[in-house]
From Swiss-Prot:
SUPFAM superfamilies: Protein kinase-like (PK-like). A motif ([NKR]KIAxRE) lies at residues 45-51. This is Cyclin-dependent kinase-like 2. Residues 365-392 are annotated as: Disordered. PANTHER family: CELL DIVISION PROTEIN KINASE, CYCLIN-DEPENDENT KINASE-LIKE 2. The keyword Nucleotide-binding applies. It comes from Rattus norvegicus.
Length: 507
């Protein structure tokens, strides 16, 4: 286990804990289940051995992938692919229930995964929201096979205490030891309602309370289960309530807003008689999945999601580290410059956001409404506008911005007062008298010629431009009460040109 770096605790339970780790060689993020000392606890050893055995033979896109198994100092360690999101997390985010289409996609995959287990004569026995992982691409994966087991041979019996109470079928609650795949189908029915409504269907506080919730909604237990109930010493001295039809509150009455197709699917899964519950293959052919061609359409979409996850999991170490550094950088404060036309109408304002990191500047253009005809000095394609606008610079280090695909021009619009200087990228806020330097790319250079005189040579691809006070070739702005210095400069410049021409003509 020395090749793994511990990144933190994901969760812990009765039999051990799960840690988030990184493989030092490949850089891959994994989840490691660390069991308690199994040599000292027979139950822990039994659960660990069962999970290892079953997961080694189960490989499916909707089951969590076991990568490695090792034992160190009496402890078993199971290394899994890392998926940090569960359906329980979704239910916490959306307490009123998930979107109908999301539930369709989740449930389709859950049934696929359970069906694969059943086809290998394995029952999960602990289906619940926290045991259903969801990848970033939306691929569902069943996990925690500690209670799973192969179907019994004729005459063999199971342990009776399995599954979290709220998702436990009636046969498990009364202590039947000859149950089968139907216990997983029951849990699916509980999940359908919970995912759509946001609340557990049967939130019993004890086994007898759980039975009461079930019987109030679905009616009396079958005779075999009633007999087992009264034989079970756990329920000694307790009588089952007799639920009359008028007292029952069926699903359609309890959830009148749910579509009929949802109630139909849930009722099939929640049949009080386990022998009458459908198989997973039958559920996938239910109208809930077949209406509007959902099953066929989503099967193709799911394949793309699975391929995407496979690519992400097989990234080389260097790429993963680079990607991690990039993600970390997005979380840190970055200094940015916002060059914005402050005189334009607010409804038609254009702005350019420049992200500065090291020597690189990314430019992202954001538009609000239509473009102003007299906005910034340069269009995206480099052509000049008819006017000049003032420049507003502010620190936007807290703004989250995506990387643009095609960075635009890196030169901000010129100020009204051409003798003044806007703050440089690394300079303090405020104006500095003298010469203004702009760093522009190769694409922009040719559009700046009317405004600038080249100074000392600069590194390849970057040019320093000295903006002089000459305005002979510069397009003039419209008159504004905020720009008397420019009007004065233009007037004086025009007089000098006129005097110069008169002198030339006389000579």
């Amino acid at each position: 286990m020395e090749k793994y770096e511990n990144l933190g605790l994901v969760g812990e339970g009765s039999y051990g804990m799960v840690m988030k780790c990184r493989n030092k060689d490949s850089g891959r993020i994994v989840a490691i289940k660390k069991f308690l000392e199994s040599d000292d606890d027979k139950m822990v050893k039994k659960i660990a051995m069962r999970e290892i055995k079953l997961l080694k033979q189960l490989r499916h896109e909707n089951l969590v992938n076991l990568l490695e198994v090792c034992k160190k100092k009496k402890r078993w360690y199971l290394v899994f692919e890392f998926v940090d999101h569960t359906i329980l997390d979704d239910l916490k985010l959306f307490p009123n229930g998930l979107d109908y289409q999301v539930v369709q996609k989740y449930l389709f995959q859950i049934i696929n995964g359970i069906g694969f287990c059943h086809s290998h004569n394995i029952i999960h026995r602990d289906i619940k929201p926290e045991n259903i992982l969801v990848s970033q691409s939306g691929v569902v994966k069943l996990c925690d096979f500690g209670f799973a087991r192969t179907l019994a041979a004729p005459g063999e019996v199971y342990t009776d205490y399995v599954a979290t109470r709220w998702y436990r079928a009636p046969e498990l609650l009364v202590g039947d030891v000859k149950y089968g795949k139907a216990v997983d189908i029951w849990a699916i029915g509980c999940l359908v309602i919970e995912m759509l409504m946001g609340q557990p269907l049967f939130p019993g506080e004890s086994d007898i309370d759980q039975l009461h919730h079930i019987m109030t909604c679905l009616g009396n237990l079958i005779p075999r289960h009633q007999e087992l109930f009264y034989k079970n010493p756990v329920f000694a001295g307790v009588r089952l309530p007799e639920i009359k039809d008028i007292e029952a509150e069926p699903l359609e009455s309890r959830y009148p807003k749910l579509p009929e197709v949802v109630i139909s699917l849930a009722k099939k899964c929640l049949h009080i008689d386990p022998d009458k519950r459908p198989l997973c293959a039958d559920l996938l052919h239910h109208d809930f999945f077949q209406m509007d061609g959902f099953a066929e359409r989503f099967s193709q979409e799911l394949q793309l999601k699975i391929e995407k996850d496979a690519r992400n999991n097989s990234l080389p170490k260097k790429f993963q580290i680079r990607k991690k550094e990039k993600d970390d950088a997005l979380g840190e404060e970055r200094k940015t410059l916002v060059v914005q036309d402050t005189n334009a109408d607010p409804k038609t304002k254009d702005s350019k956001v420049l992200k500065v990191k090291g020597s690189k500047i990314d430019v992202e253009k954001t538009e609000k409404g239509t473009r102003a005809s007299n906005g910034s000095c340069l269009h995206d394609n480099g052509t000049s506008h008819k006017g000049l606008s003032s420049t507003s610079l502010r620190d936007c280090s807290n703004v989250t911005i995506d990387h643009p695909r095609n960075p635009g021009t890196a030169i901000p619009p010129l100020t009204h007062n051409l003798s003044a200087v806007a703050p440089g990228i690394n300079a303090a806020m405020g104006t500095i008298p003298g010469v203004q330097n702009y760093r522009v790319d190769e694409k922009t250079k040719k559009y700046c010629n009317p405004f600038v005189k080249p100074s000392q040579p600069s590194p390849s691809g970057i040019y320093n431009m000295n903006v002089s006070a000459s305005v002979s070739n510069c397009p003039l702005p419209r008159k504004s009460k905020h720009s008397p210095p420019l009007d004065l400069a233009v007037s004086m410049g025009a007089r000098r040109v006129k005097l110069y021409l008169e002198t030339e003509s006389e000579t």
